[in-house]
């Protein structure tokens, strides 16, 4: 056999070994954890606007949900969310995850490629990947 030919299995193993690790991950969508700290009687989430950009939702809509879930008052000022009261990272991250499950991820295919659309008086979570539509209640 001529030395110009290579074994298919050897070439396949070589090609697979050169692929980046991200290719083998099942999840391509990861929500960053909230970077928060307590200052006096307030909690600041420093990367709130960055999180809202990753999940592709308006910061005000996202903040309204988090504030309602935590049962407190607050406001988005610049890139951060200011909450009245003392809240730990765990509780803030759990509310963010709940928001993502309800208002970002498609219930059929689980992909984050969704938009909130309005048809008539009803709001839907529409998946741009599979086309599924799920009615949602607004906050």
Curated annotation (Swiss-Prot):
The keyword Iron does not apply. It comes from the Archaea. InterPro entries: IF2/IF5, TIF2_bsu_arc, Transl_init_fac_IF2/IF5_dom, Transl_init_fac_IF2/IF5_N, Transl_init_fac_IF2/IF5_Zn-bd. Pfam families: eIF-5_eIF-2B. GO terms for molecular function: translation initiation factor activity. Keywords: Initiation factor, Protein biosynthesis. HAMAP family: eIF_2_beta. Heterotrimer composed of an alpha, a beta and a gamma chain. Belongs to the eIF-2-beta/eIF-5 family. eIF-2 functions in the early steps of protein synthesis by forming a ternary complex with GTP and initiator tRNA. This is Translation initiation factor 2 subunit beta. It comes from Methanococcus aeolicus (strain ATCC BAA-1280 / DSM 17508 / OCM 812 / Nankai-3). The lineage of its organism: Archaea, Methanobacteriati, Methanobacteriota, Methanomada group, Methanococci.
């Amino acid at each position: 056999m001529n030395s110009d030919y290579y074994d298919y299995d050897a070439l396949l193993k070589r090609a697979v070994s050169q692929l980046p690790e991200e290719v083998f991950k099942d999840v391509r969508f990861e929500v960053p954890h909230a970077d928060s700290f307590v200052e006096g009687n307030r909690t600041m989430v420093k990367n709130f606007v960055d999180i809202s950009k990753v999940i592709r939702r308006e910061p005000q809509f996202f903040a309204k949900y988090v504030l309602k879930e935590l049962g407190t008052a607050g406001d988005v000022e610049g890139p951060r969310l200011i909450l009245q009261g003392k809240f730990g990272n765990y509780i803030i991250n759990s509310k963010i995850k709940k928001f993502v499950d309800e208002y970002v991820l498609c219930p059929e295919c689980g992909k984050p490629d969704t938009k909130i659309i309005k048809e008539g008086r009803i709001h839907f979570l529409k998946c741009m990947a599979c086309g599924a539509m799920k009615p949602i209640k607004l906050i």
